[in-house]
Amino acid sequence: MTHQFNPTILREYDIRGIVGDTLTEADAYALGRTYAALGRDEGARRIAVGRDGRTHSGMLESALVRGLTEGGIDAVLIGMGPSPMLYFATHYLDVDGGIQVTGSHNPADYNGFKLLLNGRSVFGAEIQAIGQRSSRGHWSEGNGATEEVDIREAYVNRLVEGFSGKPYRVGWDAGNGAAGPILDMLVDRLPGQHHVIFSEVDGTFPNHHPDPTVEKNLADLKELVEREQLDFGIAFDGDGDRVGAVDGKGRVIWGDQLLMILAAPVLDELPGATIIADVKASQTLFDRIAELGGRPLMWKTGHSLIKSKMKETGAPLAGEMSGHIFFKHRWYGFDDALYAAVRLIEAVSQSGGSLTGIMDSMPKTTATPEMRFEVDEVRKFAIVEEVRDRLSGDGAKVDATDGVRVSTGDGWWLLRASNTQDVLVARAEAADQSGLDRLVAQIDDQLAKSGVKRVEATH
């Protein structure tokens, strides 16, 4: 038996599509069969399976598990929860890998799968290989068993293990995502006062879209912090692997700023350690890590790529602008928004001040948000290469780690191709608005030379 996946769902970091359109129940079954065959090739026998709270996650999970067991893999079902709980399961349980059914932070009609096998994320070429193997029908046969295991208590216990934070007044917004029930358990274990909103799981996301990196999605949290006069607020995305925050004045604390705060206590304990951030992060972050005695490392955007670089370098902490925060220090190295929140409370406690005070003391720069604009899929990487070649010929200071990051006397700008969508991504940062306008004009000038006009993408 063979199965053809819609090629658009085989993404760089996971499998994701629109349910009933590009992603079907048959795809979930075929993924289970193909993953079982790949896993058995590597000696895998037991796989943990979790799901988020989307309306179709249960249906996809059932088909996936049927495929796994018919392929000879035992499935250990941990039920509904955030993606990091599934990642935790791969360390806590006697299993050889894991699959989370999740649409991440995509709109409600999307869903997909995040895959782990033998201690690694399955991404890039390995995801393409799943499609190729499925189309050839190279499936294993067997009769695997299913088992249900409740690890929620163990997961929450591990989240607060060794916690040394002070009692703060904190607002929390779970965005009706899969982290909600775990959050309700977590705040009962933390000192202080906790005001939780939208912890009821609802896959239609009735209150706001669960993406805390978009400021409008933090409006309810800001209002809660202001109304209750809280110290700060914390928000999660739909599957609980990305974190957002606001201070006591309602100011958004972006991913690179969070990493700046979280790095200080880690470097106190591990002087000289490497701290990784993606190419979209502020230069002030890399400068601050160096000031604290750490080794800043700029790396490619993408949570699977960051995890791989952490393993390679032994870095205890990494983060992305998108709110993925990865702790290897006292944790497992995977991105977990709930754990990042716990460590944020600790970091503020250890600073001796308030999160608002920390924000007040941060270097003041002016930056664009992440600018995304649609381009022809076949041209997106070529455009970046053209820009790189022109700038290198002009003697500009260019970092080509991931796209083009150009350093100037008073700032920097970035242009890179998205690995997951037909868009180019740009960002710029300068000392003041006039400098920022000049850098954005440089981006537009380079795009124009490659025949592209910057029009904001709708996705």
Predicted regions and their residues:
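Phosphate-binding and adjacent anionic-ligand microenvironments
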Residues: 270-459
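An N-terminal, well-structured beta->alpha segment
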Residues: 1-66, 70-71, 148-168
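Short glycine-rich phosphate-binding loop at a beta-alpha junction
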Residues: 44-52, 169-171, 273-279, 316
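Gly/Ser/Thr-enriched, mixed-charge loops and adjacent short helices
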Residues: 109-228
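Glycine-rich phosphate-binding loop
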Residues: 96-110, 225-247, 252, 296-298, ...
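N-terminal small/polar loop signature for handling phosphorylated ligands or for N-terminal nucleophile
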Residues: 37, 41, 45-110, 157, ...
